[in-house]
Regions:
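Conserved, compact domain cores that house catalytic/ligand-binding motifs in diverse enzymes
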Residues: 39-99
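Glycine- and acidic
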Residues: 30-37, 60-65, 78, 105-107, ...
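Extended acidic/polar, glycine-enriched regions
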Residues: 1-44
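Short amphipathic alpha-helical segments with coiled-coil-like heptad repeat character
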Residues: 12-13, 57-60, 198, 263-264
């Protein structure tokens, strides 16, 4: 519920309510996915999360039913995955994807956030992966190309993404320096965008752009592994240009999630970053999504279930209903 505050102007005033009416506004969709196990806490987490996802499925996929009730690219990107398994309503994914991108010409990043632009590109490939709907990929492909033209126009002389005027370098609500130079997490998302562009180009038999974006992904991946890796610390630093060699989880999670480094380095990341309590923990459910996805991909299922119990289970314990 949203809340209304009624202020009485008279000191001794009194108001009596005859009735309060609530309007429950939601899409009438069938659940195609379900979950049940012997762990009742996990069952409650699933049920609460599924209900939350359903509430956020309006004309578009909202970021939250309480606030902001807005279409944010990163939140939508995650919600697409949930939808494929929970409702499998492809229309809402297509509507949200088109709304996020907006009309031509592209003059700013999606929601002004570069990471959200990269997710927008990746989300289209993942939509095809889950649905096989090539017609939609074909329909938005011209916008994908113009989006990447915009992205390329804002890279630095080394073809790295660096913050430009009007950009909000978000990544996560986390305390690390995101404005000093070309941060690693953004480069890794750009690699993912290049890779997904190459895959979509291949679907449409656009050999020239398949080769172009595939080569760009490979070149940037090599550059990131060369410049951002710190062997002594066993992880990728946030920004190699500042000299402080600080490490946070975000870029290292992307390295695991998108398979952007060697198996040897992945093992070091798990030991020296992910399981290192001295590294600033992830504090938002938004980025926990990526962390737990990465942990599942590399088989760290105990880590995943422990986090579900402590983080989302903690919300349930405090009385959360969404």
């Amino acid at each position: 519920f949203r809340f209304v505050c009624i202020e009485l102007l008279e000191e001794e005033g009194m108001v009596q309510f005859k009735a309060v009416q609530g309007v429950f506004h939601y899409l009438d969709l069938d659940y195609v996915g379900s979950f049940s196990c012997s762990d009742e806490k996990l069952n409650r987490i699933w049920d609460t999360a599924a209900y939350t996802a359903h509430l956020n499925m309006q004309e578009f996929l909202w970021d939250g039913i309480k606030r902001d009730r807005w279409i944010w690219g990163g939140d939508a990107y995650q919600s697409f995955f949930v939808n494929y398994y929970l409702m499998n309503d492809n229309d809402i994914v297509r509507r949200t994807t088109r709304m996020l991108r907006g009309a031509e010409p592209m003059t700013m990043h999606v929601n002004t956030i570069p990471d959200y632009t990269f997710y927008w590109i990746a989300g289209i490939w993942e939509y095809y992966f889950h649905t096989g709907d090539l017609d939609f990929v074909r329909a938005v492909y011209p916008q994908m190309l113009s989006t990447m033209t915009f992205v390329e126009s804002r890279l630095d002389e080394d073809d790295l993404y660096t913050k430009r005027r009007g950009d909000w370098v978000f990544v996560d609500w986390s305390q690390f320096d995101k404005d000093s130079g070309p941060i690693c997490a953004e480069q890794m998302l750009l690699i993912r965008a290049y890779d997904c562009m190459a895959k979509c180009a291949a679907l449409l038999h656009d050999d020239k752009n398949e080769e172009k974006f595939g080569a760009a992904a490979k070149a940037l991946c090599e550059k990131v592994n060369s410049r951002y890796w710190d062997e002594e610390k066993g992880g990728f630093v946030d920004d190699y240009t500042t000299g402080n060699r600080s490490i946070t989880r975000h870029a290292n999670i992307f390295a695991l999630l998108y398979d952007l480094t060697s198996e040897d380095r992945k093992a070091k990341i798990i030991t020296h970053v992910i399981k290192n309590k001295e590294i600033l923990p992830i504090t938002t459910p938004y980025f926990e999504f990526f962390e737990l996805d990465a942990m599942c991909q590399i088989g760290e299922f105990d880590y995943m279930t422990d986090m579900l119990h402590s983080y989302w289970g903690g919300m349930i314990k405090l009385g959360a209903t969404t």
